[in-house]
Amino acid sequence: LHNYRNNPCVVMWSIGNEVPTQCSPVGYKVAKFLQDICHREDPTRPVTCGMDQVTCVLANGFAAMIDIPGLNYRANRYQEAYDKLPQNLILGSETASTVSSRGVYKFPVKDKKSAQYDDHQCSSYDVEACSWSNIPDEDFALADDHHWTIGQFVWTGFDYLGEPSPYDTDAWPNHSSMFGIIDLASLPKDRYYLYRSIWNKEA
């Protein structure tokens, strides 16, 4: 906190992401303890936490206590969270996790969850996601339809080694994730241009 609190790039602090204590009786206390430290050391910025256990955190007060409640995926539960929480806003602390391979196009083109193919690739049409994630269109629709969604952090900007979903149980020869907007060679996938068209109106 001390190292970065004077940096204008810092807009909020995060006290965790998908912490295992979200549903435990001590989770609320630990989160409040950490948030209080952030408030004490930097009273100018709010605090968030990336939460993936939506049922728990809405019921046990965990999400209601955080300055900016961040939901990881669960786009279908944003409205429920907004209705139940006092903050009147929701942050997409992890969004999309769409899976795609650059330059690979699968037919027929339709939305699919956890689709697998013999070539261990995913379609570049950006219509495939994991069982727990979604495609970018859902996040864009939330932002367009609800003023109380204040932004999103996409998982992920770049592919990375590890988590080769949807092939994590039959990974060979996959070593790389397929979540990235940009692949391991630093080349943009089709999704890069989709995000750019939404976020950069000058492009």
Across the structure, where does each feature detected by a protein language model lie?
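Extended substrate-binding grooves/exosites of carbohydrate-active enzymes
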Residues: 1-203
